[in-house]
């Protein structure tokens, strides 16, 4: 029969394994692990570039000051800087995004499957919110002004909307993953390739199939660049 000390040791080992399993991104085991995007090695993230080939440019991205176009249907542009743009972010568990909103523009309901987001308003006003998981689906929302900060928990559906019909808005978001991912809800549901059966969606949304067919025929705008 196993001794109490053996059970304690097993519990500690299981806790350590569980902690590693739920960690958002792999933690660094050295000063840095610049992503080698050309390596044939397949890992969760990227293999490390040989440190002797690393230079300051691997940790650098030119200024995000130019105002992107906001002429798409939703009236916003998300300029994401993640490990694909700054390879030095590999294993560091962070990325950043600038979001530009036209008057009455929005960053439509979406989720980041691998990251929590913290958003700061740089210019203008934003109405923001997130919805909790089933069964309550509670909406937490707030009107933010310049300098205000709001947090969107990992994996939850959230949005931002510029309520001003005359002035644009700008926000900066930090995300707790080198590659947070983004799933825009309408795009995923109505713009999937191949499309989800209209029988399934009609029952899910409790509408006529003709309504689903019309929605699936629309062009679902991608505002992430």
Curated annotation (Swiss-Prot):
Gene name per UniProt: GER6
Keyword Metal-binding among UniProt keywords: yes
Domain Cupin type-1: 63-213
PANTHER family the UniProt entry points to: GERMIN-LIKE PROTEIN SUBFAMILY 3 MEMBER 3
Protein name: Germin-like protein 8-7
Function: Plays a role in broad-spectrum disease resistance. Probably has no oxalate oxidase activity even if the active site is conserved.
Superkingdom of this protein's organism: Eukaryota
UniProt keyword terms in alphabetical order: Apoplast, Disulfide bond, Glycoprotein, Manganese, Metal-binding, Secreted, Signal
Secretion signal, residue range per the UniProt entry: 1-23
Subcellular location: Secreted, Extracellular space, Apoplast
UniProt record similarity statement: Belongs to the germin family.
GO molecular function: manganese ion binding
InterPro entries named in the record: Cupin_1, Germin, Germin_Mn-BS, RmlC-like_jellyroll, RmlC_Cupin_sf
One Pfam family hit: Cupin_1
Glycosylation, residue list: 77, 136
rRNA processing in keyword set: no
UniProt organism field: Oryza sativa subsp. japonica (Rice)
Residues engaged in binding Mn(2+): 110, 112, 117, 158
């Amino acid at each position: 029969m196993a001794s109490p000390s053996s059970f304690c040791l097993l519990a500690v080992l299981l806790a350590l394994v569980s902690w590693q399993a739920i960690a958002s991104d792999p933690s660094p085991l050295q000063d840095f692990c610049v992503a080698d995007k050309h390596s044939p090695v397949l890992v969760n993230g990227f293999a490390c570039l040989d440190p002797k080939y690393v230079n300051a440019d691997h940790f650098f991205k030119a200024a995000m000051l130019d105002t992107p176009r906001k002429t798409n249907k939703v009236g916003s542009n998300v300029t994401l800087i993640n490990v694909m743009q700054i390879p030095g972010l590999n294993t560091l568990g962070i990325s950043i995004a600038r979001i530009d909103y036209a008057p009455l523009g929005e960053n439509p309901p979406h989720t980041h499957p691998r990251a929590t987001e913290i958003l700061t308003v740089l210019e203008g006003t934003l109405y923001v919110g997130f919805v909790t998981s089933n069964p309550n689906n509670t909406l937490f929302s707030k009107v933010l002004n310049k300098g205000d900060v709001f947090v969107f928990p990992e994996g939850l559906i959230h949005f931002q909307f510029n309520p001003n019909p005359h002035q644009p808005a700008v926000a900066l978001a930090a995300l707790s993953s080198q590659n947070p991912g983004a799933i825009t809800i309408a795009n995923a549901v109505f713009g999937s390739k191949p499309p989800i059966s209209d029988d399934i969606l009609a029952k899910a949304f409790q509408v006529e199939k003709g309504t689903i067919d019309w929605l699936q025929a629309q062009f679902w705008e991608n505002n992430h660049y």
